[in-house]
Amino acid sequence: MIQVLLKYYSGMTPIKTAESHVVEALAALAQAQRLRAFRALVVAGSEGLTPSALAALLQIAPSALSFHLKALSHAGLVSAEASGRNLIYRAEFARMNDLLTYLTQDCCQGQSCAVVPEATQACC
């Protein structure tokens, strides 16, 4: 087992950049309000939500939501697009899928395991 791990971690140079992005994304999601906001945007799909609709849905102050959306945006998990006088926030599904792929890519050292295949399939 240790030899397999040493072999895996011996070529860390290209992974370091990926790891820093993963750590940044997980850190952004490691706060209850941000996690709820991200999940709400995932549910909203490609239509996205305005900050006011998202704040009402989550029952949090718009100023607090703004802080959380900035953190999620900085981590690349959400994007904002101007639509008239409003901003529309959307989950970045490609980033989310990259994160899930990174977390599960070497599951069980390539052997079959108890991971449910549907749980690791990409979304959207």
Residue ranges and their predicted role:
Residues 1-21, 42-43, 93-124:
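Amphipathic alpha-helical dimerization/coiled-coil segments
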Residues 56, 73-74:
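Alpha-helical residues within the helix-turn-helix
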Residues 69-70:
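Short, hydrophobic-biased segments on the C-terminal half of alpha helices
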Residues 81-83, 113:
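Conserved catalytic-core motifs of GNAT/GCN5-like acyltransferases
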Residues 16-61, 83-95:
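N-terminal helix-turn-helix DNA-binding core of bacterial DNA-binding proteins
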